């Protein structure tokens, strides 16, 4: 049994500031494009989250604030990634995590992202139950896949595809249904975006008090904008900037 889309897909991985796709931020996107089983192009983009990167995230990924300070915000970076994803099929390791982040950011910025997905984690859990861990690192070690720079998006994406090839070789003939891409049914909770009145008020506050704001105001939700306004007012009243 052969599924054509197995050899025509986008493999991608994200690094983020946390695990909540609505409240946390993307800081790195790495993707590779597969056609006829070969890597034909790559996509890599650092993303400015607009907030300090948590210390534990820097410890895990090696990504620092300096590395993203001049990077585009997600509102600027997302369109080029969506253009790169020119197929209906995606692949990742624990793909639902990455999918939900992209889906959430697309929703807040007015884009759509509806794909069918293959997940090497799901496949490994089905066929490699004897392994103590089915995380990407241990699976790569099991198959002898070189995973340099783990927890960096582009390297994880490349390793994920090599892992997929190994799993397909070993288990495609055992149960081909495990290699059929499936819909991910998840929609982000609806959030109202920043209002035009809030945008103007924030802009006036920032200009009047000569503040430096390291966030992309255009992508704020209504509640996030309210929190930022309250924070600025508290700082101004206390004499801080």
Q: Which ranges hold each PLM region?
A:
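Acidic two-metal-ion nuclease catalytic site recognized across multiple nuclease folds
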Residues: 165-241
